[in-house]
């Protein structure tokens, strides 16, 4: 069954760790943002997209998003992530969809099939997120970097995006818990337990210059199309 979900693409970050604008950085012939938008444009379960960006770049991003027919609105972001997502939800509130997916624009390797999997899991479980099991050994350290405790990685997942939930659940969770790093944190704090959608696709966030180089290699190899 095809869903009629909405997506909020968050592109309002500062790119401080990159040292340059990662959202509009060139990646395999397109920008990072365009690759993220394309996955949601191609997903049959997504009927509309709201793009959230820095206020001073509104016109630039409106022009870039014009090539994507599902982008219905480009709106300014807030001072923190939750405020940016709430701005997107406010746009959608005039005619709220049953489900909303939130995605970091800086994850340009996302595939339409993974978006669909997360949305269908959210429909079944109220909320869901793309996730991968933690595979590295984990140790807790002190302020000076001295390692003091081993942390079991059993049942630990690294959260990614998209993260999806019903409109009302997400709206209420973010309003009640604005100081969070992602939507899953707000939902859990509100007593909702999202489903982890475990996958093996490359879906890392562009954080450092090396990430962009790796994404370029994978995009040129057409990794997602061969993996789905």
Specify the residue positions occupied by each region the protein language model found.
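Short aromatic/hydrophobic "clamp" motif used to bind/position activated sugar donors
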Residues: 99-101
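N-terminal glycine-rich phosphate-binding loop and ensuing alpha1 helix
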Residues: 2-58
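Conserved core of the sugar-phosphate nucleotidyltransferase
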Residues: 109-195, 228
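Residue-level signal for inorganic ion chemistry
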Residues: 9, 33, 88, 103-104, ...
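Short beta-strand-to-turn element immediately C-terminal to the catalytic PLP-Schiff-base lysine
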Residues: 27, 139-142, 206-207
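Catalytic beta-strand/loop signature of glycosyltransferases that borders the donor
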Residues: 195-202
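Hydrophobic helical membrane-anchoring modules
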Residues: 203-228
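Conserved N-terminal catalytic core of the sugar/cofactor nucleotidyltransferase
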Residues: 34-97
């Amino acid at each position: 069954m095809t869903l009629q979900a909405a997506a909020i693409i968050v592109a309002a970050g500062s790119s401080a760790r990159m040292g340059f604008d990662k959202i509009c950085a060139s990646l395999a012939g397109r920008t990072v943002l365009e690759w993220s938008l394309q996955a949601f444009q191609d997903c049959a379960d997504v009927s509309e997209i709201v793009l959230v960006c820095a206020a001073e770049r509104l016109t630039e991003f409106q022009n870039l998003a014009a090539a994507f027919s599902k982008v219905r609105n480009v709106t300014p972001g807030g001072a923190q992530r939750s405020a940016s997502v709430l701005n997107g939800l406010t746009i959608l509130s005039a005619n709220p969809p049953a489900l909303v997916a939130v995605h970091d624009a800086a994850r340009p390797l996302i595939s339409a099939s993974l978006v669909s999997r997360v949305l269908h899991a959210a429909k079944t479980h109220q909320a869901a997120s793309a996730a991968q099991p933690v595979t590295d050994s984990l140790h807790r350290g002190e302020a000076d970097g001295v390692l003091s405790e081993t942390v079991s990685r059993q049942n630990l997942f690294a959260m990614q995006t998209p993260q999806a939930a019903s409109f009302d659940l997400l709206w209420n969770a973010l309003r009640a818990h604005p100081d969070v790093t992602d939507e899953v944190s707000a939902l859990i704090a509100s007593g909702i337990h999202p489903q982890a959608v475990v996958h093996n696709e490359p879906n890392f966030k562009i954080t450092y210059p090396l990430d962009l180089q790796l994404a370029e290699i994978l995009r040129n190899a057409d990794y997602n199309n061969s993996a789905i």
